[in-house]
Amino acid sequence: MAKTQFDEVSWSQTSTAKLLRSAQFVTSAANPKGYPEDKGIEVGFVGRSNVGKSTCLNALTQQRRLAHASKTPGRTQLINFFQLNEHVKLVDLPGYGYAKVPIAIKEQWAKNIEAYLAKRDALRGIVWLVDARRELVGEDLLLLEWLVSQNIETRLLLSKTDKLSRNQAQQALHRLNKQLELLNVPTKLVSTQVYSSVSKEGIEVLTQRLALWFSVPTELEDDLSNKVTQSPTEIENDEVL
């Protein structure tokens, strides 16, 4: 994975939270021809259909309708780009794993996701949502193997932990970490945490991770910080999709 052309300057958690609130939709693309220019910093969001990617993006940015969650799993086939400022974007990749989607469409999705992950120089890291009630299987394991082989930093979020007790959520996190250990996955490359869009558990921890991935030229840091404004929109307890 090629490095961004920018010198690295860490954002504080507070600055990152403000930056996230400035998110705006840029474009949707079905293939690389429709992507924005490959520059700056991008963080991609992946996960199975109906795991809650859109809800996670909305919670992070404190915008209830920034990312639209489809009521029909497997409906979203496009890659969606959201601009935080002129240098930083969030990227919502199509959900995978929905059984009722035709094989031809599944294969096309896989090609589109792989094309983005393999060839996007701006990609700094991946936020991967997995259901806390499920183990990594099938397509999950294929994606994991591929991310590791491409040396892509990944934060695995155990989502929907609001459906579990605190003890059950911690047990699920332990099982996931044990599974990754047995698969010899480097902990410096793939890290894990619990997350809930309902209780907001894990939002601050995830924001800290994003702060490490969001870096800008030193000479632009103060200017960009001044341009970031707080959105008045507040997140409500939306249904976890």
Regions found by a protein language model. Give the residues of each.
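Conserved G1/Walker A P-loop phosphate-binding module
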Residues: A2-K100, V216, L220-D222, N226-L241
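Canonical P-loop GTPase G-domain recognition
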Residues: L20-P32, K163-D223
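Conserved nucleotide-binding/hydrolysis micro-motifs of P-loop NTPases
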Residues: A30, R75, V88, G95-G97, ...
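Switch II of P-loop NTPase G domains
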Residues: Y35-D38, P73-N80, P94-R124, A132-W146
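Short, glycine/charged-enriched secondary-structure capping and boundary segments
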Residues: K39-G40, L60, I103-K106, L141-E145, ...
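Helical mechanochemical/support elements of P-loop NTPase systems and associated helical scaffolds
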Residues: R65, L78, K89, I105, ...
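Residue-level signal for inorganic ion chemistry
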Residues: F82, S159, L206
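Conserved C-terminal guanine-recognition region of P-loop GTPase G domains, centered on the G4
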Residues: E114-L189
